[in-house]
Amino acid sequence: MAKAAVTKRHHFMIQKLLILLSYGYTNGLDDAHSLRCNLTIKDPTSADLPWCDVKCSVDEITILHLNNINKTMTSGDPGKMANATGKCLTQPLNDLCQELRDKVSNTKVDTHKTNGYPHLQVTMIYPQSQGQTPSATWEFNISDSYFFTFYTENMSWRSANDESGVIMNKWKDDGDLVQQLKYFIPQCRQKIDEFLKQSKEKPRSTSRSPSITQLTSTSPLPPPSHSTSKKGFISVGLIFISLLFAFAFAM
């Protein structure tokens, strides 16, 4: 029992380390503005309680916040472009919440890991496309135990480990879910890109890398088709070096 607990804590530490380093990787590639949406699916114990919560932001400024009870858009940015972007995303997000709720409720997981009904945290990151094919990254975290990522640029999936891969393979075979993830950005791309361009023209506040406790989802590695800068190579190298130290510490 004690050994199993240590192993679980060790695995969780590695996952959080990967999150922190991958955050540094994506921030180091360029200074482009990006849209970030965080979705949380919780135990739907009552129809009167929020089981889905969504927040979308650009440069840490919230442009949309909704849940399954209050399905209307609220914005922290009073600009017309922010409102237009949020309104365009509202219905796709409501639809995706329902799809993800059905998906996670039908997903069989190890109850010793999830401790009850599995909760799902999803992070979508979309950098300004600059005329290129729009590509988004979808990061999935089930109960802080199963992690996998979907890249719309090349329609590829990556899991953090074999256990996560079992669940990931079932999700990737769901055509309806894949289509929703793939076309989430394209259906609002014009408004999103216009808003990101508008944001780029404004002075950008200096942001700090989040602490490990603030991070809720993981991206194991950047997609192989992405171009890699020197900062990217350094971050990837740090990931592998840190993992080597972590495994050596556990032995």
From Swiss-Prot:
This is Retinoic acid early-inducible protein 1-epsilon. Residues 209-219 have a biased composition (Low complexity). Residues 196-228 are annotated as: Disordered. Residues 226-251 form a propeptide. It comes from Mus musculus (Mouse). GO terms for cellular component: plasma membrane; side of membrane. The gene is Raet1e. Disulfide bonds join C37-C56, C88-C188. Gene3D superfamilies: MHC class I-like antigen recognition-like.
